[in-house]
C-alpha cells in the first residue's frame, strides 16, 4: 500500500483524489493537509471531502507533523502552499505529485530541480487529452505559427483563482518555445484601447462564469481561414 497525503483536500481535485484513493486497493490515505486557519482543520478527511463518512484520517494544517508517515504527497492547493510542500518533500525525500498552478518560470524550475533528487511529477494539467492537444499545438506552430496570429481563449468557473490558467500558460510557453521566443516577451492579456495587433504576440483571454468546466481554445488566424484547436472538459 502506498501511504498517501492529500494537500488541498477541500478543493475539487482534492475531493476527487480522496475518493479515488479511498476506493483504491493500492493507496492508503494517512492525512489531509489544508491551509492554516481553515474551519475544517481537525476534522476527518472523509467528512470534509463529502464522502459522507469518517475515514479515520485527520486533516491538519502542518505537513511536517504527518509527512514522515507517507510515501507520496499529492498536492492540488495554492501557489504559496505548493512551494512549502515542495521544500518539505525535498527535506524528507518524499515523492511528490503537484497539479497546483500559478507558478512563475523561476518557481517551475524549482520543481524541475527537485526532480533530480526525489520522485516528482509536476503538471499544470494531468488530462491525457490536454497533453495530446499540446502536441498538436507544437505541430501547428511549427507549420504555420510565424504566418498567423495566435490567440488563446480559456474558460473556467467563477471560483478559479488564477488567470490565465496554468494550462493556458503552459500552452503559450510551448508555442513561444516553438517560435524561438519567451512567453513573457510575447503574451498580451486581454485588449483595450486602440492600435493594430502587434505581430508575433500571443493573445490571452480569460472567461470566468458560473460553474463552467475547464475549456481551452487556441486560434491560429490567417487571411481567409483560421485553425482552432480546443479541449473542453464536461465536468
Place the predicted regions along the sequence by residue.
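An anion/phosphate-binding loop that grips the pyrophosphate of nucleotide cofactors and donors
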Residues: 70
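A conserved short beta-strand
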Residues: 31, 96-97
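Nucleotide donor/acceptor-binding cores
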Residues: 2
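Conserved NAD(P)H cofactor-binding loop of Rossmann-fold oxidoreductase domains
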Residues: 77
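Rossmann-fold NAD(P)-binding glycine/threonine-rich loop
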Residues: 80-92, 99-122, 128-140
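C-terminal substrate-binding/catalytic lobe of Rossmann-fold NAD(P)-dependent oxidoreductases
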Residues: 5-7, 12-67, 146-235
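N-terminal Rossmann-like NAD(P) cofactor-binding module of classical short-chain dehydrogenase/reductase
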Residues: 73-74
Amino acid at each position: 500500500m502506498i501511504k498517501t497525503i492529500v494537500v488541498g483536500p477541500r478543493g475539487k481535485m482534492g475531493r476527487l483524489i480522496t475518493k479515488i484513493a479511498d476506493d483504491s486497493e493500492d493507496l492508503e490515505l494517512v492525512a489531509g493537509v489544508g491551509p492554516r486557519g481553515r474551519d475544517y482543520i481537525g476534522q476527518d478527511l472523509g467528512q470534509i471531502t463529502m464522502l459522507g463518512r469518517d475515514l479515520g484520517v485527520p486533516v491538519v494544517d502542518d505537513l511536517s507533523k504527518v509527512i514522515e508517515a507517507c510515501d507520496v504527497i499529492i498536492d492540488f492547493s495554492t501557489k504559496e502552499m505548493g512551494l512549502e510542500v515542495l521544500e518539505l518533500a525535498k527535506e524528507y525525500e518524499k515523492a511528490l505529485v503537484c497539479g497546483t498552478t500559478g507558478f512563475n518560470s523561476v518557481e517551475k524550475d524549482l520543481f524541475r530541480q527537485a526532480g533530480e533528487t526525489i520522485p516528482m511529477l509536476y503538471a499544470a494539467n494531468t488530462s491525457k487529452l490536454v497533453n495530446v492537444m499540446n502536441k498538436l499545438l507544437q505541430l501547428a506552430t511549427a507549420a504555420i505559427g510565424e504566418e498567423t496570429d495566435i490567440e488563446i481563449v480559456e474558460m473556467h468557473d467563477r471560483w478559479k483563482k488564477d488567470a490565465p490558467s496554468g494550462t493556458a500558460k503552459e500552452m503559450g510557453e510551448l508555442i513561444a518555445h516553438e517560435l524561438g521566443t519567451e512567453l513573457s516577451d510575447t503574451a498580451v492579456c486581454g485588449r483595450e484601447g486602440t492600435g493594430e495587433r502587434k505581430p508575433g504576440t500571443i493573445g490571452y483571454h480569460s472567461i470566468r462564469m458560473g460553474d463552467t468546466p475547464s475549456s481551452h481554445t487556441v486560434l491560429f488566424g490567417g487571411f481567409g481561414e483560421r485553425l482552432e484547436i480546443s479541449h473542453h472538459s464536461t465536468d
